[in-house]
């Protein structure tokens, strides 16, 4: 089977990830579980010669790994990681949706579209690796593209979903190809007249600082963070800075944060997997807790904040049970 046929078969079986190496049988991940795939692994070296450019091949040789994205036929796009291991080069491939998903299809909290109307501020999407953060960000961009007149600038590593400008002008920049780092791309973005800035990941204190500055100066910033809950996301941002800077960062965050959407995936009774969400909205009470460093109280605020649209993972779980999904 060629790669297009493999991907078509994977889509048919709701595969999320493919693992390929010429030294052992192909495997794929379905509903979170790794299984043997019903096809022989293609020649990984040949695939990489086709998919990687000269710079990416040089990175793979020098660092032993490289991240990339590639488009195949039928508008199918893959996010890939090629890495050297004892038995040769391996490929881990994540299948991306061939279309921009709708927030309603993901079961996102109903208040999220209203939050996306904010003219400035920071909205975080958090969760473990493989929890669907990129898909949710893509749905947010898709919503804005249909409902807002704005300039959206994305900084991604690599570019995953490809957007066609509709009501919005959308420009996508890839780290390592169009700019060197998230921080340098974000610094440049402040001079490029965006209304919305999408950051693939908040990786370091410099990027976090610039993101907060952008959020304070009239931009809506959408970004991801690897944490398992909303309260942990706030703590992670603050803890990225030395002790003497924590209080100023708390003040910035208390003023500029709009919401933290955390998510995780569970096996769906019907098909594939279903997302569970936790949503923290920055109300005046939440802002005060952030400012005072009392993030341990945030879970209680979320639990009692349903009237403004907040939701806990447990409440989200009960909704999915009621829908017959879990």
Model-identified regions with their sequence ranges:
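Short, flexible helix-loop junctions that flank or precede catalytic/ligand sites
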Residues: 1-326
């Amino acid at each position: 089977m060629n790669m297009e046929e493999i991907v078509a078969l994977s889509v048919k079986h709701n595969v999320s990830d493919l693992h390929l190496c010429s030294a052992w049988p192909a495997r794929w991940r379905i509903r979170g579980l790794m299984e043997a795939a019903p096809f022989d692994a293609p020649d990984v070296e040949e695939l990489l010669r086709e998919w990687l450019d000269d710079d990416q091949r040089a990175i793979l040789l020098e660092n032993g790994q490289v991240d990339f994205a590639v488009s195949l036929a039928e508008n199918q796009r893959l996010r890939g990681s090629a890495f050297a291991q004892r038995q040769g080069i391996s490929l881990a491939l994540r299948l991306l949706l061939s279309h921009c998903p709708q927030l309603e299809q993901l079961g996102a909290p109903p208040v999220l579209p209203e939050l996306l109307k904010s003219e400035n501020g920071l909205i975080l999407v958090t969760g473990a690796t493989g929890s669907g953060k990129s898909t949710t960000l893509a749905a947010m961009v898709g919503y804005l593209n249909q409902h807002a007149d704005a300039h959206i600038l994305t900084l991604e590593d690599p570019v995953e979903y490809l957007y066609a400008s509709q009501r919005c002008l959308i420009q996508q920049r890839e780290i390592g190809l169009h700019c060197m780092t998230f921080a340098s791309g974000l610094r440049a973005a402040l001079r490029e007249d965006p209304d919305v800035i999408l950051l693939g990941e908040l990786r370091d204190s410099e990027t976090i600082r610039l993101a907060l500055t952008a959020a304070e100066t009239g931009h809506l910033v959408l970004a991801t963070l690897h944490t398992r809950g909303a309260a942990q996301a706030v703590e992670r941002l603050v803890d990225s800075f030395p002790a003497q800077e924590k209080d100023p960062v708390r003040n910035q965050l208390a003023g500029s944060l709009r919401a933290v959407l955390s998510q995780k995936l569970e096996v769906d009774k019907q098909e594939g997997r279903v997302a569970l969400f936790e949503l923290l909205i920055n109300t005046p009470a939440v802002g005060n807790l952030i400012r005072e460093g009392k993030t341990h109280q945030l879970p209680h605020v979320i639990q009692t904040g349903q009237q403004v649209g907040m939701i806990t993972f447990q409440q989200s779980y009960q909704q999915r049970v009621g829908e017959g999904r879990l």
